[in-house]
C-alpha cells in the first residue's frame, strides 16, 4: 500500500500497522500455512504490547487484503486475531468494502473466516457498483455504549440514506438473494476459479497464484527457483496490464502482482475464456522481458 500512502499525508499519527499475513512471502522454511497464520497474528500482540494495551482502541483489517494485492490469510489467522483482541479488550473492525456481499462466497467475509467483529464497513458490492453507497454496521458491544452513555450519535455524511442509492442496494440484494449468488460462488464457480488459478503456478513468470471466492492474485517473478523478483523500475506489472488491456482483459497491477475481482454472475465458460486471456498476456509479457534480456 506504500504507493497509495505516498499520495497522501501519511502515516497518520496514532495509527500503526503490522505486516500482512502473506505465507508465500513471509513464511519460514517448512512453515505450514496454519502455523504461519498463528505466528502472523502474533505480530498484532507484539505491537499491542509495544504500544501499551491501554492505548490501543481497535484493530481494523480487511478479511482478504484487496488493493494491497489480494493477500489471502491462512484459516488460522483471523480466529487468532479474535483471541488477541478479546484478551486485551480491543475492538475488532472488519473492513469489508471489497469482501462483503458474496465476493468470498458469503454475505459477509467474517462468516467465512470465523470471527465476530464489533464494526463492519461496507460499500461497493451492496449496489454491485451501479451507484455509490457505503455504510457501517455496529455490533451490540459498541451500540450499547452509545445508547447508555452517549444518547444520540451525532455523526453522518452529506449523502447518508440517499433514497436512490438505497433503492438500488435493495434491488441488488434482492436479486443476489433470489439467484443465490453467494452460494454459487462458494460451491461452484469459486472452486472452479481456484482450480484454474492453481494451474497458473506452472507458468514461468508466476511465483504464486491464489484465489478466495471471486478474488484472485498472482505474483510475477524473475526466477522461480530463487524467488528473485524483478527490479521495480522495470514496471513488470504495468507491462502485463498493458497486454491485458490490449486483449480485452481487465487485470489490476499492484506492483508486480496482478489481481482480479470478476463479476459474481460469471459462468464456468466465461472463466475459461478469462483464463485463456490471462495465459496469453503472461506469455506476451514473458516474451517482452526475454527479448529485453530481463529474464531467461
Where are these regions (language model features)?
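Conserved N-terminal phosphate-binding loop of PLP-dependent enzymes in the Aspartate aminotransferase
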Residues: 1-296
